[in-house]
Amino acid sequence: MSSGAPLNVTNPNYDIEESRFGKIVCYDQSLLFEKREQKGWESGSTLASSLPFFITQLFVANLSYRVLYYLTRPLYLPPFVAQILCGLLFSPSVLGNTRFIIAHVFPYRFTMVLETFANLALVYNIFLLGLGMDLRMVRITELKPVIIAFTGLLVALPVGAFLYYLPGNGHPDKIISGCVFWSVALACTNFPDLARILADLKLLRSDMGRTAMCAAIVTDLCTWVLLVFGFASFSKSGTWNKMMPFVIITTAIFVLLCIFVIRPGIAWIFAKTVKAGHVGDTHVWFILGGVVLCGLITDACGVHSITGAFLFGLSIPHDHIIRNMIEEKLHDFLSGILMPLFYIICGLRADIGFMLQFTDKFMMVVVICSSFLVKIVTTVITSLFMHIPMRDAFAIGALMNTKGTLSLVVLNAGRDTKALDSPMYTHMTIALLVMSLVVEPLLAFAYKPKKKLAHYKHRTVQKIKGETELRVLACVHVLPNVSGITNLLQVSNATKQSPLSVFAIHLVELTGRTTASLLIMNDECKPKANFSDRVRAESDQIAETFEAMEVNNDAMTVQTITAVSPYATMHEDICVLAEDKRVCFIILPYHKHLTPDGRMGEGNSSHAEINQNVLSHAPCSVGILVDRGMAMVRSESFRGESMKREVAMLFVGGPDDREALSYAWRMVGQHVIKLTVVRFVPGREALISSGKVAAEYEREKQVDDECIYEFNFKTMNDSSVKYIEKVVNDGQDTIATIREMEDNNSYDLYVVGRGYNSDSPVTAGLNDWSSSPELGTIGDTLASSNFTMHASVLVIQQYSATKRQAAVTAAAATTVMGAVAGVTGNNLESAGGDAKMTRDAHEPFMKSMYEDEDEDDEEDHQYGIHR
């Protein structure tokens, strides 16, 4: 407290002075360690020491942040909004000035303890920021992102300085330092949050998304350089630092030390430990201790300790398993528990009421709007000179306003050096809040991807000619899904005349730990090091299994892909990838797995929802495989044995059954496959009881007859094919016939049509017992545990442009109605402070069938090619 300030003698423990720099508290530190007569259980108050108070503060901070996060999630706002609101909730203008909060939650005498833990959490959080940033992504081949980034910085810095000076509230002695920190906070762009916004809107793989991310990386790195310069230029009192040359030189030496000594040294040590097979907790503790040591070094150099933590995070080898081990041990605890303390500290420093005493309200609005528009205008003008479309330029400019924890770090750095007083600090905090509120909703509303997905003809197996390549997208969640799908592909008769092109996609759930570098997967930046050990090992094994299938068959090509997405929008990635690769058939695993006793377990409900969504939105035909031991087909049949493998195709009628027949027909070329096609024909009693209109039934029956006739004509001389017709009157007759078939022949695989929305007389009465609508009536019956114990089932739905467009339109209408009503949907939440909720904001494939595009053009989805 400055000399001559009036003392508050009403409280002998501490005195408070209020100035433009906020509340300055002076208290007797010996009171914290005051010896009391009561000992142990005789203590008069359990909250008399700092530890119980800290636990209380930790609980209040986490509870407040969680409540605000859940309240802002339905509005599709980033977690950064909840972070700022959590701090402002306890600001002096809201709850921070109440007697109860001051006395029992955030007393002034324990502020030092709170700030200590908050700063420690910040140091480790910045370390994780550097740990998750892969500098290989800075290898930019185009100059457009670099020009956009530097132009935005060069314009935002002087404009930020002018906006700081415009209200006339800055302290006269701190104008220069205040302009620097205000400008840096305005110019910075938070790369991790920007990447997650693009992931939410399915724009990561768009040209606009790539340009924005590259520009954000350059801006992020330049922000750190400017921040270090700000630390070095000004002393703790906000005036020029006479030791600035020493600070800059020592900091530059430490940077070179990290590049040429620390990084190679850590890489060498970890290479030795991995070779010896010893990577454990000791190495993690070594790294965590190094964070504190590097922070101490940069603090001694004259810059903030977060600089050392960030540089040390960049120094950890990107491809080493230790990165993932550190994130698993540190991320959730840090961002979910300790970081809310930092937000509370930011809020305690902001005083909206105090700011309004010095700031004109109209001028405050002008400054906030100007702060947001400066990057948009700059980016648009720069982009137009580089022939970037206007809509893309506007979207990039809006994304450059993405703020995050780094912006708060800059403001608090200016607050610590007294470069920013309380009104200006509060003013800028509100500006950051407004920018965060506007960016993603504005982008979702104003930017609609102009590119549509490619138009292609072969969207069904039935339309594939005998000498045309069959392109299949095989989806895998976990390793047990692989064996059945690979063996189904093995018996799909890939030949030189009709090759099989397989795109095997490993579906990985997007969680709060997923770093921005994992979201932005490409050929140069491989994301393996960011996976957990289990997922990484599983992904490798899945890729090896599919690649081995390619080695054993010259007529088959395999490309393995890893898709990272939340369950709520995973079907979008599957559909977009299917359209992009021009596949005509998607294979999905059934969500239930076989138990040791031969029955079907409960399964994963999220996987079931994915299957249902894919069936509704798929751009091609879809098959769901219920695997009950398809591995037997490969293990025995491909050793040259003469034993035939029995495949039964159950034909009821309709487009789905015709598609199923086409796929089963393709298998006939395999010398080990024996196909039996059973057509169920409704009897006269069934037609009369069902009340079928003659014209409707005859029209559909005519198409079925033509398909069956063609099949019989072309396979009449094939001894491996058998065709049977069964007359049935209802669903019970159909089930009895299938049971009779099972008793007389042991089938390995059933191929059936889904028969969605079909009301066939031969399945009458079976719909009442259906538990899995995605399998259809016959498929659900065959998949039930009490029907068959060893035969796998492939349920196929044929692509229909009319049905798909209707489903997409209905889904879009539901989304709009849900947004109006405040319905949140099934969006995924994550526990981390940097976690980003996802949303089903738009359908990038609604009118894909009407637009043409180049085959190799990448679309708005995120996936990585496994080499």
UniProtKB/Swiss-Prot annotation:
One BP annotation, GO: proton transmembrane transport
Residue ranges of coiled coil: none
Gene symbol of the encoding locus: CHX23
Subcellular location: Plastid, Chloroplast membrane; Endoplasmic reticulum membrane
Tissue: Specifically expressed in flower buds and pollen. Expressed in leaves, roots and stems.
Membrane topology: Multi-pass membrane protein
Phenotype seen when the gene is deleted: Mutants with impaired chloroplast development that display aberrant chloroplast structure. No defect in male fertility, due to redundancy with CHX21. Chx21 and chx23 double mutants are male sterile.
GO CC field: chloroplast membrane; endoplasmic reticulum; endoplasmic reticulum membrane
MF terms in GO: antiporter activity
Taxonomic lineage: Eukaryota, Viridiplantae, Streptophyta, Embryophyta, Tracheophyta
Taxonomic source organism: Arabidopsis thaliana
Annotated stretches, region: Disordered: 848-867
Membrane-spanning residues: 43-63, 75-95, 112-132, 146-166, 175-195, 212-232, 242-262, 283-303, 336-356, 362-382, 393-413, 427-447
Domain of life where this protein originates: Eukaryota
Protein name, per record: Cation/H(+) antiporter 23, chloroplastic
Its job: Operates as a K(+)/H(+) antiporter or Na(+)/H(+) antiporter of the chloroplast envelope that functions in pH homeostasis and chloroplast development. Monovalent cation transporter with a preference for Cs(+), K(+) and Rb(+) relative to Na(+) or Li(+). Required for pollen tube guidance, but not for normal pollen development. May also be involved in the development or function of the female gametophyte.
Family: Belongs to the monovalent cation:proton antiporter 2 (CPA2) transporter (TC 2.A.37) family. CHX (TC 2.A.37.4) subfamily.
Bias-annotated ranges (Acidic residues): 851-860
Membrane among keywords: yes
